[in-house]
Amino acid sequence: MPDVVVVGAGVIGAACAEALSAAGVDVTVIDRGTPAGGTTASGEGNVLVSDKEPGPELTLAIASRREFGVVLARLPEQVADVEWEAKGGLVVAKGEPEPLEKFAKTQREAGVDARVISPADAFELEPLLTRAVTTAVYYPDDAQVQPVLLATALLAAVRARGGEVRAGVTAIAVRQKDGRVTGVETEAGVIECDAVVNACGPWAGSFGTAAGGPIEILPRRGMILVTAPLPECVRHKVYDADYVGAVGSGDADLQTSTVVESTRAGTVLIGSSRERIGFDDAVKVHVLRELARKAVGIFPFLADVPVMRTYGGFRPYAPDHLPVIGPDPRVPGLWHATGHEGAGIGLAPATGRLLTELFIGVPPHLDPSPFRVDRPAVVGVS
């Protein structure tokens, strides 16, 4: 019998399972689909400290950036190549430079390496950048990873330590006795355990309800364009200053902001969009057109580059823009790890570490209270 069943084999569930198993906890991971086949597969692989205002999420991001080295070193050798690239990020503005410079200053005060550079320096970093740029901030700690490779490698580490990963197993409810979790009910039967981790991403709200611990997690749709393979053309993660505002917005309407980056395969990823439209997965041509238009505004050469494909997915959105990490006080033995929206790849290592620290009862490496389950925005109490 496992100690813990993690429901959800995306990057957050995989990171929690890996950290728990590294601490000696017996873990089983289940997913109704294939591992890393949901939200994780629709991500860009962003590991960013540059897009977050000072506060709890930035603190988690800084900790997670440090934790990546620890986690990657624990991976089995045969799956250790997750296309990790510490390429750095470049945020550019084409208007008044003061807002971007002010934002960078507040981040530096919070411990981020944020370097305001001149347009000439920006063009040296990215020669194909539009000459309309008026100011830029360079973030050497921004990085990129292949999200599916990362999640599957984390799960491979769980298996290597004796844990189990089961695909195609749908969790239905949590079984309790004397007020504590005793197992998780699935379509394939009951898996007995002492604790259950709800890592269901944008579906965490519905599973939380089924488990007796409802939480307010909503899906937020995002779309990405993928170009045909190209010679080296975009060297860093490059995005416009509007990206920060879009990340932190709670507006349900469509928002787009430019983020452009290359992959090891030579393709260029173009994002990003955010829209709260439930689980509507229809391809919206007007969204793709807007992404392309804005990307050309940053990198004019993209106007002549063919788009090979597009993909999108649903990201787990919490109304106060903070992840939910920790025990559910209403159901002893039920834990949650969700609500990271589009930042789950970058926040996964610190999330796994924090949940594990709380689970085994050691002092956490950062203050867990901002991410607690029983906060008003998540459980709807005042």
Residue spans for each PLM region:
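Short beta-strand to alpha-helix junction loop
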Residues: 59, 91-99, 137-156, 282-287, ...
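Short hydrophobic core segments
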Residues: 5-7, 191-203, 207, 352
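Helical element adjacent to the flavin cofactor pocket in flavoenzyme catalytic cores
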Residues: 137-194
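C-terminal catalytic lobe of FAD-dependent flavoproteins
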Residues: 147, 280-282, 286-382
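Active-site substrate-recognition segment that forms the wall
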Residues: 18-19, 45-46, 80-85, 202-329
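Glycine-rich FAD pyrophosphate-binding loop
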Residues: 22-41
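N-terminal Rossmann-like FAD-binding beta1-loop-alpha1 element of flavoenzymes
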Residues: 3-28
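Dinucleotide-binding Rossmann-like beta1-alpha1 core, especially the glycine-rich loop
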Residues: 45-125, 295-296
